[in-house]
Every structure is written in C-alpha cells, then in structure tokens.
Amino acid sequence: MTSVLRLVLLAISALSILSILTPSPVLAQENPYIVAYDHYLEEPGNLEIEYFSTYGTQRGGNDFHAFWAEFEYGATAWWTTELYLDGQTTFKDSTIFTGVKWENRFRVLKGEHFLNPVLYVEYEHKSGADKILKEGEGHDVEADFLAPNSEARKEHINEMELKLILSSTYKGWNFTQNTLAAKDLSNSPWEFGYALGASRPLALKASAKRCNFCPQNFVAGAEMYGGLGDRHSFGLHDTSHYLAPVLAWNLPSGWTLRVSPGFGLNHNSHQFLMRWGVAREITGFGSMVSRLFGGHK
C-alpha cells in the first residue's frame, strides 16, 4: 500500500505543478464546508485538486491522522464528478491506504431559486480502517475505530450513498441541509445521517484592487453533522454528532485554504477533530486535455 500512496502523491504533485503554470482568472468563491455540501457545482471543463487532513482524538486507543485527495471535474453545467483516494495513519500503529470513492452531484434546476436541490450519488470501496469521517451515518460511534489497522483493514466495504442537498443563498448567507441514506451492498440495512451548514463572506463588496487579505476573500460559518440510525433503529440512540466552525480563505491565485476544528456533542463522538485542506482550481482543464489528444479547441 506504500507504493499506492507514493503514486497518489506523485499525481497530486504533477497536477499541482500544472496548476501553477496555468493562468488563473477570477474564480467564484469556494464554500468553507468540509462535510456539508451546498448547491454550487464545479464550472464545466474545470478541474479542482484538493487535499484534506483530519487529526482525531481516540479515547481508549491511539489518536489518528486521516487524509484524502479529491479530483473534482465539472463534466457539464448540471453534473460534477469527483474521485477520492483515502488513507490514514494511526499513531503507534501504521500508515495504510483505506479506499476509493466515486462521487457525482446533479443539479436539478437551472438558475438560482429560493431552494436549490442537488442529487448526490456515490460508490465507495473501502476497508474497515477508513477514518476520514467525511459524514455521519447510522450508528457509527468512536468505539468503532479502536481496532488496530492490521485487523480493521481485513474488512472490505462496498457502499452506495445517496444524498438530497437543499441549499439556499440569501443576502450573502448560504444555508444548506443534507439528508443522507447509505447502503452497504452486503446484507445490511439502510443507514441515515444529516449535515447542516451556514456560511457568509466577511464582506460582500469586492475590493477594487487585487489583494490576498481583503475581507471578501474569507468565508466563515459552521456545520453540524451526525448519524440518524438505520432502517431497524431510526433515531438518535447510539449515534455520534459534531459541531464545527469553518473558515475558507480564497486567494486570487486560485488557491483555497480551509480550516475547521470540530467538537463531539455526545459521549459516542470523538472529542476533537481538527481538519484542514488546500485546493487549487485548474480552469479549462477539459479543453487542455482535448487539445493534447488532438481534439478540437
């Protein structure tokens, strides 16, 4: 699995060099959320490369550092597709590759509306050692992460996940609600979860000058997420829940930095999750690839 991680890092490095060499026009602001989704999709033909990291505390076991890379592509104006590569390091244990995920988001309505629905469909192949905690679902609790990597990686999970994203933007504020339903493709019941988010730029009026530290480059907010049990036991019993402030810094160069300290809200949750991420937009990536392989401009 070490060779896989090396290949992932090599791919990210190569694409990052390409992104630096590619001129970046003025881009739309990225939201600050790490778990919740709003209704904005990737621009058609653009590729966004993202790296995220989560440090998590573990009562009764070793703390961990989970990380994942995302490659998000705007296929059309109404469809964004994304590939995830996940890994984790459990302190005093080992570093392992934990899975892949293919995510698709579909915009249902054209234009802006008071409520903007987006359909989310995801397939995930992962091991039981996956710790990225990208969503809350079912009866997942902190104690589930106690197994050593050598044992947890033996469990193989093939999962389908569906979300209904309802998002609205009003006077600069974005409010979003995500409802989740996930199904292990083995003989397991449907599991449910939620994510809520609210955010706003620190300033709505853009500066006349290009600057890195202008208030409008910062988007702040909060998100809350957790599990809602499964088909046989729906509700809050034996579920975990988190509340996290979120902050995004959108640089004129096309880079976005995110940070989010998260706090467990009950005894089933990890007490503390520290998340951060960096993203870079490559505009016109689809056109560049088409030209490279002899397509039309």
Question: What is the predicted role of each segment?
Answer:
Residues 27-297:
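Transmembrane beta-barrel domains of Gram-negative outer membranes and organellar outer membranes
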